A protein has these predicted regions:
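Generic N-terminal targeting/processing segments that precede catalytic cores or assembly contacts
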Residues: 1-130, 134-216
């Protein structure tokens, strides 16, 4: 039943979509790692739904670092970051506790927690929990940057449309490739492919359906 991930560095997720808050606890961070709260805020802004292909639930995601940081650096003790919830519409889910939605985690959550889980908005398995993942990832990303390591992901395929692969020089991906992914819109290397992905997604949405994707 645990919600703890990792070994040397562990991540614990807490909260539900329609609870008071969500958040994450990182344990195993070395002391003295700079924590850039402005960078965390920027990453949460990037995660925030944008455009017609995103969820209608939009929150500002103010966060509070409850522990593990002092004078702008990690202390080495567990770092807890909490994000209050504000945009819930629990009435939309009235009567749905006995009706599992296709493509959602409702049924697996029911089986795992024997019917006691908070089903509203997907509960602990809502897309809302990705805000906590992004916040924790921004902190871990800062630790990796100090070692010369960068992280980047692009939407390699969506709705049958392929993005081009990363360009590499001597086994390294140039910074420009990763920087391009931070531009507004779909995180793709080929903007024309991104436009086709978006159009295919909107067409599926208009038809009451959805599309899948592959990241790299």
């Amino acid at each position: 039943m645990k919600n703890v991930y990792g070994n040397a560095l562990t991540l614990t997720l807490f909260g539900e979509s329609h609870g008071s808050s969500i958040g994450a606890v990182l344990d195993g961070l070395s002391p003295g790692i700079p924590v850039d709260e402005a960078h965390i805020a920027r990453e949460l802004t990037r995660r925030r739904p944008q455009g017609q292909t995103a969820t209608a639930r939009v929150e500002q995601d103010p966060f509070v670092i409850e522990s593990g940081v002092f004078n702008g650096c990690t202390t080495g003790t567990p770092l807890c970051i909490r994000i209050p919830n504000a945009g819930q519409h629990s009435g939309d889910y009235a009567g749905m506790q006995d009706c599992a939605r296709p493509g959602h985690s409702d049924y697996p959550a029911f089986c795992k927690y024997h019917g006691y889980s908070d089903y509203r908005g997907g509960g602990h398995f809502s897309g809302r929990i990705t805000a906590a993942l992004v916040a924790a990832g921004a902190i871990a990303e800062g630790a990796l940057r100090g070692r010369g390591i960068r992280i980047g992901t692009h939407l390699a395929a969506c709705a049958g449309v392929q993005d081009r692969p990363f360009r590499q020089t001597d086994g390294q991906i140039p910074d420009g490739e990763l920087d391009a992914l931070r531009e507004p819109g779909f995180p793709v290397l080929d903007r024309a492919a991104g436009e086709r992905m978006q159009q295919a997604s909107l067409a599926a949405k208009a038809d009451g359906g959805s599309v899948g994707g592959v990241t790299e």
